[in-house]
Curated annotation (Swiss-Prot):
Binding site for L-tyrosine: Y37, Y175, Q179
Residues in the signal sequence: none
Name by which UniProt lists this protein: Tyrosine--tRNA ligase
Subcellular compartments: Cytoplasm
Similarity section: Belongs to the class-I aminoacyl-tRNA synthetase family. TyrS type 1 subfamily.
One Pfam match: tRNA-synt_1b
Gene Ontology biological process: tyrosyl-tRNA aminoacylation
Subunit structure: Homodimer.
Taxonomic lineage of the native organism: Bacteria, Pseudomonadati, Pseudomonadota, Gammaproteobacteria, Enterobacterales
Assigned EC number: 6.1.1.1
Renumbered ranges of motif 'KMSKS' region: 235-239
Amino acid sequence: MASSNLIKQLQERGLVAQVTDEEALAERLAQGPIALYCGFDPTADSLHLGHLVPLLCLKRFQQAGHKPVALVGGATGLIGDPSFKAAERKLNTEETVQEWVDKIRKQVAPFLDFDCGENSAIAANNYDWFGNMNVLTFLRDIGKHFSVNQMINKEAVKQRLNREDEGMSITEFSYNLQQGYDWTCLNTHYYVELQIGGSDQRWNITSEIDLTRRLHQNHVLGLPDPLITNGDGTKFGKTEGGAVWLDPKKTSPYKFYQFWINTADADVYRFLKFFTFMSIEEINALEEEDKNSGKAPRAQYVLAEQVTRLVHGEEGLQAAKRITECLFSGSLSALSEADFEQLAQDGVPMVEMEKGADLMQALVDSELQPSRGQARKTIASNAITINGEKQSDPEYFFKEEDRLFGRFTLLRRGKKNYCLICWK
């Protein structure tokens, strides 16, 4: 992606919500490489899908020759961003936040190149400049440049202040000042001139631009990404089980892959532009192919492969595809113990059982059947498989060979209703 038309290409992909000064940004990019940053607050022990668009934007800029700075908010994470939040965030301990900072830095690292010469990525932590700052310095050097009148009129704050049941503490109110100072420090240390981030960060971005101008007389620029939603208007990146995380221990690669496989037809080509590095021409060609094939679209599988490989690597992708194929075919011989652990984590419903249980009890405990009587009828009708093999004996007791790797037995009722028994 050439630097000269980078912004145009991002706009074509729908990745630009607004540019604070589009003409100035175009002129600056025409002059040569720029340093830019995106902040990631440690509000949990993992990033989630909502962080993926700005993270991939950093990668897109680096591929075009620019220098990305990934800022993890070790200090701002101790405060919490109040923007558009209905209630105040729970304050976490310093030890917890530091642990989350370390995890998030490790998650960010594979997406960027930290050893590629002049545009090598930088990992920064705003605790480095806030950790030893005293309150007098904060108020005199930073606070005096912010107008309370302007701050309370920002929509992100106004929504909270207008609620009778939930106000805003001074702690949260100071978040905007902290984030404003981040850019000033990054501008000083790394000559950062551009910030990218979610469109819900516009208020914070404009405050940072203003503070950097006041303190250093430097003109810096903001490039907010759009808020990603599904075609039906619902929030993107959520499932019935909650957020889709980038940490494989919180959302398994199989579950992650399935999330993308289940993308609606109305969203899939848009998401290919947001979350992959396929060219617009390739995406348009795929859309045309799907339209004329007379078959189920291929786009969801392309999207799932591309994004799962980006986040979990080739090994994670192959495991996800292997599990998917085995569940579809009913043959489990290719599954490894680690694959079964993914299924136990979040792939299919799971129940723990003591050895010695019979099949009818397993169907009831797993909620595949409501009662032993109904379980008996279902087994007799040849609708139950154990590890892919039909079982029609209602009096069947599990054998040692049914316990794969000594730990797992996969039950299926009909074609799609699974439960994994984890033996105690």
